[in-house]
Amino acid sequence: IGPSLGGMIALEWALREPELAGALVLIATTAQHSAQAIANSSCQRAAIRLDPEYKNGFYDSSQQPRQGLALARQLAFITYRSNIEFTERFNRNAGKQKDFAIQDYLQYQGQKFIERFDANSYIRLSQCMNSHDISVGFSSIESALQSIQQPTLVISLEHDQLYSYTEQAQLAEFIPNAEHELIPTQFGHDGFLIETKAMGDILHRFLNNKANNS
């Protein structure tokens, strides 16, 4: 079971070490990082590297590039949520610290993140996601997916701006024994962290069916 990057790792296990997985649950993920996703994550890494405290990655752990990492998180967070949610929650309302409430919210998310994450780790994870492409060693993405034999559940979140419904439908279309569920949500990609009841119901049904068919 893997959401986002975890889903990418689950796909790789299914392809490279198939005996490790009896079934797959791929949540808000993709077979290949898109050009748009690569562009966004590249800007996030640039924000970190432009921080004077980055020091080419050789910063002291007590003085990491906080401003750059906070900005990277803000850039990422825009892709994690949807315009529908932002409009309903913030619209063009005035902020307390900035001109607009949405700016205050993004600043809060950035500051919260730097208290629990390391900049170099963030860069490495970002590069890992950019390199994700299951077609490596196969003639195409489709042929790679067709080689996956495990029962598979693909879960998409409505309004996911990071990994589109089309990308996730491709997984379900070409994996031979796959089913696809779409969770209605205004929270976009982060819906898998928020729509816990819907997620739980879908997972419970899939795992029960697998147990009954074993």
Task: Describe the predicted segments one by one.
Residues 148, 154-156:
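Short beta-strand/loop motif that positions the catalytic acidic residue
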Residues 112, 131-133, 158-163:
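Acidic catalytic loop of the alpha/beta-hydrolase fold
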Residues 2-3, 157:
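Conserved alpha/beta-hydrolase "nucleophile elbow" surrounding the catalytic nucleophile
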Residues 137-142, 150-151, 161-173:
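Short alpha-helix in the alpha/beta-hydrolase fold that links the catalytic acid
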Residues 20-22, 26-112:
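Alpha/beta-hydrolase-fold enzymes
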Residues 7-18, 24:
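Short glycine-enriched nucleophile-adjacent loop
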